[in-house]
């Protein structure tokens, strides 16, 4: 079930504050976050985030096509290693 339109997108307050502060100072340093649930908003375009995937931080550069998605969608948590090939 999707989120109600009257509520608007969810973005953690601390993350939104960091983005707004960096926009005011016109800085583009990477923002480290554990908030995979936060929605990408238009004011985040052009910023680089380091999103935690449970083990390490993966770098995500936000572009216009990512608006409306969540940060966690671009930081996969499961890595599939192929099944071994039987020799013989």
UniProtKB/Swiss-Prot annotation:
Biological process annotations from GO: ribosomal small subunit assembly; translation
Any one annotated GO CC term: cytoplasm
SS bonds (residue pairs): none
MF term (GO), any: structural constituent of ribosome
InterPro entries in the record: Ribosomal_uS19 (IPR002222), Ribosomal_uS19_bac-type (IPR005732), Ribosomal_uS19_CS (IPR020934), Ribosomal_uS19_SF (IPR023575)
One matching Pfam family: Ribosomal_S19
Keywords: Ribonucleoprotein, Ribosomal protein, RNA-binding, rRNA-binding
Alphabetized NCBIfam families for the sequence: rpsS_bact
Functional note: Protein S19 forms a complex with S13 that binds strongly to the 16S ribosomal RNA.
UniProt record similarity statement: Belongs to the universal ribosomal protein uS19 family.
Name of the protein described by the UniProt record: Small ribosomal subunit protein uS19
